[in-house]
């Protein structure tokens, strides 16, 4: 509670300072990120908030990160009503994983929100301890066949990363060898292979880049339909082209259900304009190793259902590892 109060004070202070330079007619919208303040979503949210005065005279985005995942969103839903100037992030982790694996943690459903926009798309990658010389799908198959046990670092025991690892190794026929090793953040999990704590890791590309460049890890594959085409990981194989399951990580920007349609449309336009900015796109691609990925509500629902199908199929591997 203290963290939320302090976060709210900071958000209001930031909004006031921004409004001083933008005119009193602008309304501040607090954007709650329920994950680590140093994480990918929080960083993109801060960037979008800083750019919002350039694209709207009536709305200012104020980034507020409160680590807590489902608990943070529970509080947000309880404290927010239709037309409140509040937004929150959620993704497949909550709507497709927590809803099936730990439903008691969720005091909300998708119907409690109205979709505004998707903030970004992230293609997770699997990395390996460099000493293992695993540099592609064929190398991974050979390693899995010979190893008595395979440890994979992930951000949380039942996270998106955990299910991606389970779906790949499980679909290869080695789910019984999988040992998921959960860490408290995605960045920490990404560094586990370099420290020799695990054989493999699943992470955002940006979180393993430095370790890869320093020779501490190899990149095994990308959880996407095709190979990565740009950046430091260009040429890394996409698991989808081999028929293995995958999904991208998305970050949905949501308002409270019942919020006026014209307000939601204005918010969507603001985010779309920010994400179309050339500087933002360059930063997303080159610094964060993310993609602009505008979505419709139908796209969101299809994404959630795809992830749910993977969770249902590989649930026993994850919870039993």
Where in the sequence are the language-model features?
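Solvent-exposed coil/turn segments that connect beta secondary-structure elements
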Residues: 92-94, 121, 131, 206, ...
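Residue-level signal for short, function-critical loop segments
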Residues: 35-37, 156, 223, 259
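Hinge/capping helix and adjacent helix->loop/strand transition within the periplasmic-binding protein
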Residues: 28-29, 49-57, 76-85, 100-188, ...
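N-terminal (or domain-start) structured segment
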Residues: 23-112, 158-161, 171-202, 207, ...
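C-terminal capping/gating helix-and-loop segments adjacent to ligand/active sites or protein-protein/ligand interfaces
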Residues: 274, 278-294, 316-321
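Short, low-complexity disordered leader/linker segments with a strong preference
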Residues: 1-28, 319-321
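Extracellular/periplasmic bilobal clamshell ligand-binding domains
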Residues: 295-321
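C-terminal lobe and pocket-closing loops
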Residues: 207-276, 281, 302, 306-309
């Amino acid at each position: 509670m203290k963290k939320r109060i302090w976060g709210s004070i900071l958000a209001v202070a930031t909004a006031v300072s921004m409004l001083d330079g933008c005119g009193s007619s602008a309304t501040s919208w607090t954007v709650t990120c329920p994950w680590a303040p140093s994480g990918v979503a929080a960083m993109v949210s801060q960037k979008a908030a800083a750019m919002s005065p350039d694209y709207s005279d009536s709305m200012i985005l104020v980034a507020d990160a409160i680590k807590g995942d489902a608990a943070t969103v529970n509080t947000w839903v309880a404290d927010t009503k239709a037309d409140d100037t509040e937004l929150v992030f959620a993704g497949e982790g909550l709507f497709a994983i927590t809803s099936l694996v730990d439903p008691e943690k969720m005091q909300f459903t998708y119907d409690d929100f109205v979709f505004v926009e998707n903030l970004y798309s992230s293609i997770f990658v699997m990395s390996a301890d460099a000493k293992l010389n695993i540099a592609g799908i064929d190398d991974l198959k050979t390693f899995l066949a010979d190893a008595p046990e395979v440890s994979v670092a992930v951000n949380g025991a039942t996270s998106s990363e955990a299910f991606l690892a389970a779906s790949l190794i499980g679909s290869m026929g080695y789910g019984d060898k999988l040992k998921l090793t959960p860490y408290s953040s995605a960045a920490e999990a990404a560094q586990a292979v370099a420290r020799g704590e695990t054989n493999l890791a699943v992470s955002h590309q940006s979180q393993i880049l430095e370790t890869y460049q320093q020779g501490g890890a190899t990149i095994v594959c990308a959880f996407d339909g095709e190979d990565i085409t740009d950046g430091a990981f260009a040429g890394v194989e996409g698991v989808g082209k081999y028929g293995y399951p995958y999904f991208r990580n998305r970050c949905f920007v949501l308002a409270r259900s019942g919020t006026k349609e014209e307000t939601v449309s204005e918010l969507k336009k603001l985010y779309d304009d920010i994400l179309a900015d050339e500087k933002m796109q360059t930063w997303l691609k080159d610094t964060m190793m993310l993609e602009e990925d505008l979505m419709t509500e139908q796209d969101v629902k299809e994404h959630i259902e795809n992830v749910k199908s993977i969770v249902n199929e590989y649930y026993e591997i994850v919870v039993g590892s």
